[in-house]
Structure formats: C-alpha cells, structure tokens
Amino acid sequence: MTSQPTDVAIGIDGAAAPAPSGGAASGPIGTGSRGTRILGVVTLAAVALGAYLALVSSPQDETMGDVVRLLYVHVPVVTMAYVGCGITTIASAMYLWKKSTWWDVTAAAAAEVACVFTALTLAEGMIWARPTWGVWWVWDARLTSTAMLLLLLLGYLAVRRIPTDAGTRSRRSAVVGLLLLPNVFIVNRSVTWWRSLHQGTTILNTLQPKIHDQMAFALVFNIGVAALVFSWLLIHRWRLSWLEEQVESHDLDEALAERRAEAAADAATESARVGGSGA
C-alpha cells in the first residue's frame, strides 16, 4: 500500500476516493459491494467445510478427547486477533508519519475487529480451561496478559470516542495503537517468560510435531477460514468507518458554511446601519 496525497485516499476494496477533508465523496457509498458479497459467500462455504473437518472428519485426541475440537476455533481466532493488533500498530505508525486519513481509518477498523477476536479468545480460553484445568479462570500469565491486551484495545476504541476534533482524536488513538503489537509479543512469550498452565508451542512445531496429520490439516484450514472471516469484517468495518468520516466532515463543512453566512449577514447589517446613520 502506497501513500496517497492528502486529498485522495484509496478504499480498502481498491476504489479511489477523496479524503473527508474536502471535495465530494466518490468512495464507498455503502458497507458492502459485489466483491464483499462474493467474499461472504466463499467465507460461508469455507466455514461450513471447516466445521465439518473440525467436528466430524478430525479424530479425537488421545488425552483430551473431544475437548480438542475447541482447538480448531481457538487457535485461528487467536491468530487473527494478533493480525488485527499488528495491522492497527502499523497503520497507527503510518498515520503519525503520513497524516493520511486512509491509515487512520484502517487502524480504527482493524482495532475493532481485533477487539472482537480477542474477546472471543478469552471466552474460548475459559471454556477450554473448565474441562482441562477444572476452573473457568485462573490468573495464569497467558490469560492475564490476553485480558490486558483486550483492555488496551478497549482503551483504543474509547479514545476514538472522546469528543474532540478529528486530528486530535486520530493522533491520540494512534499513540495507543503503537502499544498493541508489543503487547501481542508479551502475550505470545508469556508461557516462556513466566510459570504458566498454558501449553507452549507444541502443536505445529516442525521439528517435533505433536498433532495428527488430519488434525493439523483441519487446524491449518480453519486458520484460513478465520482469515476469510477477518477480511470480510475488516473490509465492512473499513467502509463503515470511511462513511462515518464523510458524514462528520460533511457536518463540519455545513456548520462552517452556516457560520460564514451568519458572519456575512451580520457584517452586511452593520454596514447598512453605519451607512444609514451617516446619511
């Protein structure tokens, strides 16, 4: 993705659109398009096939039995949560450098989707913990660091809702966005740095694989499915964020135009009054 001039941005589906700062909008006019509808159909088909592989085709685990089937959702969701945080951090850094609305909207859209996936990660982790550890929640390093990541994402979204001008809001949220990727690294390494009940990296270890080939295929396939779901949500959220920027910019332009008209009318009235008193 290349940098665009300040008055032009490229939509996430490839359509050119002027930035909200000026000009008539020629970007997305809705939250969906033909491309997103096709992507949605492909995603639904992939979800159905992924569910079959996870629930029917894949064998039980020798130790955990059917509980292992949570793995086919948990790992893909965690992966996409990390990807969303990474996109937010990169887009935030690019916004601080380029001051481009495109990057700001991209960071905001990715953060919202990442927040959903991170919340699902915690929920699935708790469901996993109940049959394997005997409790819904423990202050384990992995669970606690993931909860902190979710709080940071919620903080990012809260900063974007603080009433202020668009530039200040974008700068403040971008600074928070820079913290997401380092926190992802902390979450990922938490099982190594601290004592943890959570297992380490053993599932897809290429040197010593500890997973059945059919289970590995189902897992990798469902990671691809999660990527499709993530992409579909990100595109729709990006388009919605762009439209919100357009509405906000339009309202601001209208308010400024009304204020200028009022000022011009006041000036004309004052001029007429002065002219009348001089006569």
Pin down the residues of each PLM region.
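Polytopic transmembrane helical bundles with strong interfacial aromatic enrichment
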Residues: 2-279
